[in-house]
Amino acid sequence: MSTYQAATIVAAPNEFRVPFPPFVQISKVQFQREAGSRLLAASGWDGTCRVYEVGKLGDISEKLVFTHGKPLLTCTFAGYNKVAFGGVDHNVKLADIETGNGTQLGSHALAVRCMEFNPMSSLIVSGGWDSSVKLWDARSYGNGAIESVNVSSSVYAMDVLKHTILVGTKDRKIFMYDSRKLREPLQVRDSPLKYQTRAVQFFPTGEAFVVSSIEGRVAVEYVDQSGEEMMKRKYAFKCHREKDTDGTELIHPVHTVAFHPKYGTFATGGADGIVNIWDPFNRKRIIQLHKFETSISSLSFNEDGSQLAIATSYQYEKEIDPSPLPNNSITIRHITDPESRPK
Protein backbone atom coordinates (compact mmCIF):
# COMPACT_ATOMS: atom_id res chain seq x y z
CA MET A 1 0.00 0.00 0.00
CA SER A 2 1.16 3.54 -0.74
CA THR A 3 0.96 6.45 1.68
CA TYR A 4 0.10 9.87 0.33
CA GLN A 5 1.84 12.91 1.77
CA ALA A 6 -0.45 15.22 3.72
CA ALA A 7 -1.40 18.76 2.67
CA THR A 8 -2.79 21.74 4.52
CA ILE A 9 -6.49 21.63 5.40
CA VAL A 10 -8.18 24.58 3.74
CA ALA A 11 -11.44 26.35 4.61
CA ALA A 12 -11.82 28.41 1.45
CA PRO A 13 -13.86 31.57 0.94
CA ASN A 14 -14.23 30.85 -2.78
CA GLU A 15 -17.29 28.60 -2.42
CA PHE A 16 -20.96 29.25 -2.97
CA ARG A 17 -24.12 27.20 -2.55
CA VAL A 18 -26.55 26.14 -5.27
CA PRO A 19 -30.09 27.21 -4.28
CA PHE A 20 -32.90 24.64 -4.24
CA PRO A 21 -30.97 21.36 -4.41
CA PRO A 22 -32.93 18.08 -4.41
CA PHE A 23 -34.74 17.94 -1.06
CA VAL A 24 -33.95 14.30 -0.32
CA GLN A 25 -30.61 12.51 -0.85
CA ILE A 26 -28.62 13.88 -3.79
CA SER A 27 -27.58 10.86 -5.84
CA LYS A 28 -25.42 12.57 -8.47
CA VAL A 29 -24.17 15.91 -9.72
CA GLN A 30 -22.60 16.37 -13.13
CA PHE A 31 -21.25 19.37 -14.99
CA GLN A 32 -21.85 19.32 -18.72
CA ARG A 33 -18.55 18.77 -20.52
CA GLU A 34 -19.45 20.72 -23.68
CA ALA A 35 -16.90 23.49 -24.36
CA GLY A 36 -18.06 26.73 -22.74
CA SER A 37 -21.05 25.11 -21.02
CA ARG A 38 -22.03 26.30 -17.55
CA LEU A 39 -24.76 23.71 -16.94
CA LEU A 40 -24.92 21.46 -13.88
CA ALA A 41 -27.35 18.55 -13.43
CA ALA A 42 -28.42 17.02 -10.12
CA SER A 43 -30.62 14.00 -9.38
CA GLY A 44 -32.14 13.07 -6.05
CA TRP A 45 -34.25 10.68 -4.05
CA ASP A 46 -37.05 13.27 -4.10
CA GLY A 47 -37.64 12.19 -7.72
CA THR A 48 -36.34 15.40 -9.29
CA CYS A 49 -33.69 16.00 -11.90
CA ARG A 50 -32.60 19.63 -11.82
CA VAL A 51 -30.44 21.59 -14.26
CA TYR A 52 -28.73 24.81 -13.19
CA GLU A 53 -26.70 27.42 -15.03
CA VAL A 54 -23.62 28.21 -12.95
CA GLY A 55 -21.82 31.51 -13.50
CA LYS A 56 -18.18 32.24 -12.77
CA LEU A 57 -19.06 34.72 -10.01
CA GLY A 58 -21.55 32.58 -8.12
CA ASP A 59 -24.67 33.60 -10.02
CA ILE A 60 -26.91 30.55 -10.49
CA SER A 61 -30.22 30.11 -12.27
CA GLU A 62 -32.38 27.01 -12.33
CA LYS A 63 -33.17 26.07 -15.93
CA LEU A 64 -35.17 22.87 -15.42
CA VAL A 65 -36.87 20.88 -12.70
CA PHE A 66 -38.11 17.57 -14.05
CA THR A 67 -40.30 15.81 -11.48
CA HIS A 68 -40.13 12.08 -11.96
CA GLY A 69 -42.13 10.94 -8.94
CA LYS A 70 -39.85 8.07 -7.90
CA PRO A 71 -36.35 8.29 -6.40
CA LEU A 72 -33.64 8.95 -9.00
CA LEU A 73 -30.27 7.25 -8.54
CA THR A 74 -28.41 8.80 -11.47
CA CYS A 75 -28.38 11.35 -14.26
CA THR A 76 -26.19 12.40 -17.17
CA PHE A 77 -26.13 15.06 -19.85
CA ALA A 78 -26.92 13.50 -23.22
CA GLY A 79 -25.75 16.07 -25.72
CA TYR A 80 -25.98 19.83 -25.64
CA ASN A 81 -29.65 20.26 -24.68
CA LYS A 82 -30.73 16.96 -23.13
CA VAL A 83 -30.40 15.25 -19.78
CA ALA A 84 -31.10 11.58 -19.06
CA PHE A 85 -31.95 10.04 -15.71
CA GLY A 86 -33.10 6.81 -14.08
CA GLY A 87 -33.89 5.30 -10.71
CA VAL A 88 -35.86 2.85 -8.64
CA ASP A 89 -38.80 2.55 -11.04
CA HIS A 90 -36.43 0.85 -13.55
CA ASN A 91 -37.04 3.43 -16.30
CA VAL A 92 -34.54 5.33 -18.45
CA LYS A 93 -35.85 8.79 -19.33
CA LEU A 94 -34.65 11.71 -21.42
CA ALA A 95 -35.66 15.37 -21.02
CA ASP A 96 -35.18 18.39 -23.25
CA ILE A 97 -33.54 21.13 -21.17
CA GLU A 98 -35.10 23.97 -23.16
CA THR A 99 -38.71 22.73 -23.28
CA GLY A 100 -38.84 20.48 -20.22
CA ASN A 101 -40.50 17.76 -22.28
CA GLY A 102 -39.58 14.23 -21.27
CA THR A 103 -39.77 10.83 -22.89
CA GLN A 104 -39.15 7.27 -21.74
CA LEU A 105 -36.45 5.46 -23.73
CA GLY A 106 -37.02 2.08 -22.09
CA SER A 107 -36.32 0.25 -18.87
CA HIS A 108 -34.24 -2.22 -16.89
CA ALA A 109 -35.73 -5.14 -14.95
CA LEU A 110 -34.59 -3.51 -11.69
CA ALA A 111 -33.39 -0.08 -10.58
CA VAL A 112 -31.19 2.00 -12.87
CA ARG A 113 -28.07 2.71 -10.80
CA CYS A 114 -25.63 4.40 -13.23
CA MET A 115 -25.82 6.42 -16.43
CA GLU A 116 -23.13 8.01 -18.62
CA PHE A 117 -23.02 9.47 -22.15
CA ASN A 118 -20.69 8.85 -25.09
CA PRO A 119 -20.69 12.03 -27.21
CA MET A 120 -18.71 10.31 -29.97
CA SER A 121 -21.64 8.01 -30.74
CA SER A 122 -24.55 9.89 -29.05
CA LEU A 123 -25.17 6.81 -26.94
CA ILE A 124 -26.49 6.82 -23.38
CA VAL A 125 -25.05 3.96 -21.32
CA SER A 126 -27.04 2.67 -18.34
CA GLY A 127 -26.21 0.09 -15.71
CA GLY A 128 -28.79 -1.53 -13.46
CA TRP A 129 -29.28 -3.66 -10.41
CA ASP A 130 -30.58 -6.26 -12.86
CA SER A 131 -26.93 -6.98 -13.76
CA SER A 132 -27.23 -5.47 -17.22
CA VAL A 133 -25.56 -2.69 -19.20
CA LYS A 134 -27.68 -1.11 -21.94
CA LEU A 135 -27.05 1.34 -24.77
CA TRP A 136 -29.66 3.90 -25.86
CA ASP A 137 -29.62 6.25 -28.84
CA ALA A 138 -30.16 9.80 -27.56
CA ARG A 139 -31.34 10.89 -31.03
CA SER A 140 -34.24 8.45 -31.42
CA TYR A 141 -37.09 7.69 -29.03
CA GLY A 142 -39.30 4.69 -28.46
CA ASN A 143 -37.08 2.07 -30.07
CA GLY A 144 -35.77 0.59 -26.82
CA ALA A 145 -32.17 -0.30 -26.06
CA ILE A 146 -30.04 -0.77 -29.15
CA GLU A 147 -27.72 -3.18 -27.33
CA SER A 148 -27.59 -4.94 -23.98
CA VAL A 149 -25.17 -7.21 -22.15
CA ASN A 150 -25.33 -9.00 -18.81
CA VAL A 151 -22.54 -8.73 -16.25
CA SER A 152 -21.87 -10.92 -13.23
CA SER A 153 -24.03 -9.04 -10.70
CA SER A 154 -25.68 -5.68 -9.98
CA VAL A 155 -23.97 -2.63 -11.45
CA TYR A 156 -22.76 -0.35 -8.63
CA ALA A 157 -20.44 2.04 -10.50
CA MET A 158 -19.70 3.02 -14.08
CA ASP A 159 -17.70 5.39 -16.28
CA VAL A 160 -17.41 5.95 -20.03
CA LEU A 161 -14.41 7.34 -21.91
CA LYS A 162 -14.70 7.58 -25.69
CA HIS A 163 -15.98 4.13 -26.70
CA THR A 164 -14.82 2.26 -23.57
CA ILE A 165 -17.25 1.44 -20.76
CA LEU A 166 -15.90 0.73 -17.26
CA VAL A 167 -18.23 -1.16 -14.90
CA GLY A 168 -17.90 -2.05 -11.22
CA THR A 169 -20.29 -4.69 -9.87
CA LYS A 170 -21.71 -5.86 -6.57
CA ASP A 171 -19.46 -8.93 -6.56
CA ARG A 172 -16.34 -6.72 -6.92
CA LYS A 173 -15.70 -7.46 -10.57
CA ILE A 174 -14.39 -4.82 -12.97
CA PHE A 175 -15.56 -5.07 -16.59
CA MET A 176 -14.39 -3.10 -19.62
CA TYR A 177 -16.40 -3.05 -22.86
CA ASP A 178 -16.11 -1.45 -26.27
CA SER A 179 -19.52 0.12 -26.89
CA ARG A 180 -19.18 -0.77 -30.60
CA LYS A 181 -18.76 -4.48 -29.74
CA LEU A 182 -20.72 -4.90 -26.54
CA ARG A 183 -21.23 -8.66 -26.64
CA GLU A 184 -17.80 -9.62 -25.29
CA PRO A 185 -15.85 -7.70 -22.63
CA LEU A 186 -12.43 -6.30 -23.40
CA GLN A 187 -11.35 -7.22 -19.88
CA VAL A 188 -12.72 -8.75 -16.71
CA ARG A 189 -10.74 -8.55 -13.49
CA ASP A 190 -11.29 -8.65 -9.76
CA SER A 191 -11.35 -5.35 -7.93
CA PRO A 192 -7.99 -4.72 -6.25
CA LEU A 193 -9.93 -3.72 -3.11
CA LYS A 194 -11.38 -6.25 -0.69
CA TYR A 195 -14.69 -4.53 0.01
CA GLN A 196 -17.69 -3.22 -1.91
CA THR A 197 -16.97 -0.91 -4.85
CA ARG A 198 -18.37 2.62 -4.57
CA ALA A 199 -16.90 4.39 -7.62
CA VAL A 200 -14.85 3.77 -10.76
CA GLN A 201 -13.37 6.51 -12.96
CA PHE A 202 -11.05 6.56 -15.96
CA PHE A 203 -8.00 8.79 -16.09
CA PRO A 204 -8.63 11.42 -18.81
CA THR A 205 -5.95 9.70 -20.93
CA GLY A 206 -7.67 6.32 -20.63
CA GLU A 207 -4.43 4.57 -19.65
CA ALA A 208 -5.60 3.85 -16.11
CA PHE A 209 -8.59 4.06 -13.79
CA VAL A 210 -9.41 4.56 -10.13
CA VAL A 211 -11.56 2.32 -7.91
CA SER A 212 -12.87 3.34 -4.48
CA SER A 213 -14.51 1.20 -1.82
CA ILE A 214 -16.52 1.33 1.40
CA GLU A 215 -13.36 0.56 3.38
CA GLY A 216 -11.63 3.93 3.05
CA ARG A 217 -9.35 2.86 0.22
CA VAL A 218 -8.62 3.93 -3.34
CA ALA A 219 -6.73 1.93 -5.98
CA VAL A 220 -5.04 3.08 -9.18
CA GLU A 221 -5.12 0.36 -11.85
CA TYR A 222 -3.69 0.38 -15.37
CA VAL A 223 -5.65 -0.85 -18.37
CA ASP A 224 -2.59 -2.53 -19.88
CA GLN A 225 -1.68 -5.47 -17.64
CA SER A 226 1.06 -6.88 -19.85
CA GLY A 227 4.56 -7.02 -18.45
CA GLU A 228 6.02 -6.81 -14.98
CA GLU A 229 6.76 -3.09 -15.33
CA MET A 230 3.08 -2.24 -15.89
CA MET A 231 2.05 -4.33 -12.90
CA LYS A 232 4.50 -2.41 -10.71
CA ARG A 233 2.80 0.89 -11.54
CA LYS A 234 -0.51 0.00 -9.92
CA TYR A 235 -1.04 0.82 -6.25
CA ALA A 236 -3.65 1.41 -3.55
CA PHE A 237 -3.79 3.65 -0.50
CA LYS A 238 -5.84 4.38 2.61
CA CYS A 239 -7.85 7.60 2.87
CA HIS A 240 -10.95 9.14 4.48
CA ARG A 241 -10.04 7.82 7.91
CA GLU A 242 -9.89 9.62 11.24
CA LYS A 243 -9.27 8.95 14.92
CA ASP A 244 -12.20 8.93 17.34
CA THR A 245 -11.88 10.62 20.72
CA ASP A 246 -10.81 7.30 22.27
CA GLY A 247 -8.17 6.70 19.59
CA THR A 248 -10.25 4.24 17.56
CA GLU A 249 -9.74 4.56 13.82
CA LEU A 250 -12.96 5.45 12.00
CA ILE A 251 -12.98 4.15 8.42
CA HIS A 252 -15.33 5.90 5.99
CA PRO A 253 -16.65 4.84 2.57
CA VAL A 254 -15.19 6.73 -0.39
CA HIS A 255 -18.44 7.46 -2.22
CA THR A 256 -17.26 9.42 -5.24
CA VAL A 257 -14.28 10.15 -7.50
CA ALA A 258 -13.88 12.91 -10.10
CA PHE A 259 -10.92 13.67 -12.39
CA HIS A 260 -9.64 17.13 -13.23
CA PRO A 261 -9.98 17.36 -17.04
CA LYS A 262 -6.75 19.32 -17.58
CA TYR A 263 -4.24 17.91 -15.10
CA GLY A 264 -5.39 14.32 -14.56
CA THR A 265 -5.42 14.77 -10.79
CA PHE A 266 -8.53 13.51 -9.01
CA ALA A 267 -10.83 14.37 -6.13
CA THR A 268 -12.38 11.90 -3.71
CA GLY A 269 -15.36 12.47 -1.43
CA GLY A 270 -16.12 10.37 1.62
CA ALA A 271 -18.63 9.71 4.36
CA ASP A 272 -16.38 11.78 6.64
CA GLY A 273 -17.56 14.92 4.84
CA ILE A 274 -14.09 15.51 3.42
CA VAL A 275 -12.94 16.23 -0.15
CA ASN A 276 -9.32 15.43 -1.01
CA ILE A 277 -7.53 16.21 -4.27
CA TRP A 278 -4.75 13.76 -5.18
CA ASP A 279 -1.75 13.71 -7.49
CA PRO A 280 -1.72 10.13 -8.83
CA PHE A 281 1.58 10.58 -10.67
CA ASN A 282 3.66 11.57 -7.64
CA ARG A 283 1.41 9.77 -5.15
CA LYS A 284 0.73 12.86 -3.07
CA ARG A 285 -2.31 14.56 -1.65
CA ILE A 286 -2.42 18.07 -3.06
CA ILE A 287 -5.05 19.52 -0.77
CA GLN A 288 -7.75 18.60 1.74
CA LEU A 289 -10.78 20.88 1.80
CA HIS A 290 -12.61 21.82 4.98
CA LYS A 291 -15.02 19.36 6.54
CA PHE A 292 -18.58 19.55 5.21
CA GLU A 293 -21.70 19.00 7.31
CA THR A 294 -22.29 15.43 6.16
CA SER A 295 -21.25 12.77 3.63
CA ILE A 296 -19.98 13.73 0.19
CA SER A 297 -22.33 11.89 -2.17
CA SER A 298 -21.08 13.11 -5.57
CA LEU A 299 -18.37 15.26 -7.17
CA SER A 300 -17.93 16.75 -10.64
CA PHE A 301 -15.41 19.12 -12.24
CA ASN A 302 -16.59 21.52 -14.92
CA GLU A 303 -15.19 21.34 -18.45
CA ASP A 304 -12.07 23.44 -17.78
CA GLY A 305 -11.48 22.27 -14.21
CA SER A 306 -12.00 25.71 -12.67
CA GLN A 307 -15.03 24.64 -10.61
CA LEU A 308 -15.84 21.56 -8.54
CA ALA A 309 -19.45 20.67 -7.68
CA ILE A 310 -19.68 19.04 -4.24
CA ALA A 311 -22.95 17.32 -3.28
CA THR A 312 -23.49 16.49 0.39
CA SER A 313 -26.21 14.14 1.62
CA TYR A 314 -26.42 11.90 4.64
CA GLN A 315 -26.06 8.30 3.40
CA TYR A 316 -27.35 6.51 6.52
CA GLU A 317 -23.92 5.10 7.32
CA LYS A 318 -24.19 5.60 11.09
CA GLU A 319 -25.59 3.07 13.53
CA ILE A 320 -27.71 5.82 15.09
CA ASP A 321 -28.95 8.49 12.69
CA PRO A 322 -28.41 12.11 13.77
CA SER A 323 -31.50 14.11 14.67
CA PRO A 324 -32.33 16.24 12.87
CA LEU A 325 -30.79 14.81 9.70
CA PRO A 326 -28.17 17.07 8.06
CA ASN A 327 -29.33 19.24 5.18
CA ASN A 328 -28.58 18.33 1.58
CA SER A 329 -26.40 20.81 -0.27
CA ILE A 330 -24.55 21.44 -3.51
CA THR A 331 -21.48 23.63 -3.17
CA ILE A 332 -19.54 25.09 -6.09
CA ARG A 333 -15.88 25.45 -5.22
CA HIS A 334 -13.57 27.57 -7.39
CA ILE A 335 -10.45 25.46 -7.98
CA THR A 336 -7.08 27.15 -8.43
CA ASP A 337 -4.05 25.75 -10.25
CA PRO A 338 -2.08 25.10 -7.03
CA GLU A 339 -5.05 23.07 -5.72
CA SER A 340 -5.24 20.83 -8.79
CA ARG A 341 -1.88 20.78 -10.58
CA PRO A 342 0.47 17.81 -9.98
CA LYS A 343 3.23 18.53 -7.48
From Swiss-Prot:
Effect of gene knockout: Viable, but with a reduced brood size. Reduced bub-1 expression and localization at the kinetochore which may lead to the delay in the onset of anaphase during embryogenesis. Defective synapsis with increased numbers of nuclei that contain asymmetrically aligned (clustered) chromosomes. RNAi-mediated knockdown results in reduced survival as compared to wild-type animals in anoxic conditions.
CC per GO annotation: bub1-bub3 complex; kinetochore; mitotic checkpoint complex; nucleoplasm
Assigned keywords, A-Z: Cell cycle, Cell division, Centromere, Chromosome, Kinetochore, Meiosis, Mitosis, Nucleus, Repeat, WD repeat
Disordered: region residues: 322-343
GO molecular function, one term: ubiquitin binding
Predominant subcellular localization, coarse grouping: nucleus
Repeat region (WD), residues: 21-62, 67-105, 107-146, 150-187, 192-232, 249-288, 291-331
Database matches in SMART domains: WD40
Subcellular location: Chromosome, Centromere, Kinetochore; Nucleus
Residue ranges, compositional bias (Basic and acidic residues): 334-343
SS bond list: none
GO biological process entries: Bub1-Bub3 complex localization to kinetochore; cell division; embryo development ending in birth or egg hatching; meiotic spindle assembly checkpoint signaling; mitotic spindle assembly checkpoint signaling; regulation of cell cycle
Family indicated by similarity: Belongs to the WD repeat BUB3 family.
Role of this protein: Has a dual function in spindle-assembly checkpoint signaling and in promoting the establishment of correct kinetochore-microtubule (K-MT) attachments. Promotes the formation of stable end-on bipolar attachments of chromosomes. Necessary for expression and kinetochore localization of bub-1. Plays a role in synapsis checkpoint signaling inducing apoptosis in response to unsynapsed chromosomes and thus controlling chromosomal segregation during oocyte meiosis.
Subunit architecture: May interact with bub-1; for localization at the kinetochore and the onset of anaphase.
Protein known as: Mitotic checkpoint protein bub-3
